Regions:
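Bacterial Sec-dependent N-terminal signal peptides
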Residues: 1-24
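A short, amphipathic beta-strand motif
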Residues: 25-32
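Contiguous segments within soluble domain cores/interaction surfaces
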Residues: 32-56
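Short proline/glycine- and polar residue-rich coil/turn motifs
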Residues: 62-68, 130-132
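A glycine-anchored, Pro-Gly-centered beta-turn/N-cap motif
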Residues: 68, 73, 78-81
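A short tyrosine-centered beta-strand micro-motif
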Residues: 82-86
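Acidic, glycine-anchored loop motifs typical of Ca2+
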Residues: 90-96
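Extracellular beta-sheet/turn segments enriched in Thr/Pro/Gly and aliphatic residues
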Residues: 107-143
């Protein structure tokens, strides 16, 4: 009986390894209007904190801004459901600057091109499934 249990458990090890395997999320961010500041990327795996509580993101990335298109590979991301919130932080103050009525002064975007009616989209609207070994997201920065 013990031998049968050991054989069964050992047959599950490859499956268990695959579900916890780290993989790469390839990002292509386009539409940046200049080289000022940084692009801030927050990756969330639940609606908790999405999109503005970056301290609750599973990964936070800061890369130099580059007009046009930026390609970036997020390494070691466990397969699962995620949503991205991205800001072109032109003045490097680590937040999205807004003006009258909360209208953004800096560029921003969300995964799947999601947009809210009056404010940011929900996690569900922006979420996508990241699968091993790699997946990709194309994102377009928007300015008002």
């Amino acid at each position: 009986m013990i031998l049968q249990i050991l054989i069964y458990v050992s047959s599950l090890l490859p499956i268990m390894h695959q579900t916890n395997a780290q993989s790469t999320l390839k990002l292509e961010i386009s539409g940046l209007k200049n080289n000022k500041g940084f692009v801030l990327i927050a990756i969330f795996n639940s609606e908790l904190g999405f999109p503005d509580k970056k301290e609750l993101a599973v990964k936070k990335i800061r890369i130099p801004a580059q007009a046009g298109v930026i390609s970036y590979d997020v390494q070691d991301l466990v397969p699962g459901t995620y949503a991205l919130a991205i800001i072109h932080d032109e003045n490097d103050n680590q937040r999205l600057d807004t003006g009258l009525f909360g209208i953004p002064k800096e560029g921003f975007c969300f995964s799947k091109g999601a947009m809210g009616t009056f404010g940011p989209p929900t996690f569900q609207a922006a979420s996508f499934v990241h699968k091993a070994p790699n997946s990709s997201q194309k994102l377009q920065i928007k300015y008002w």
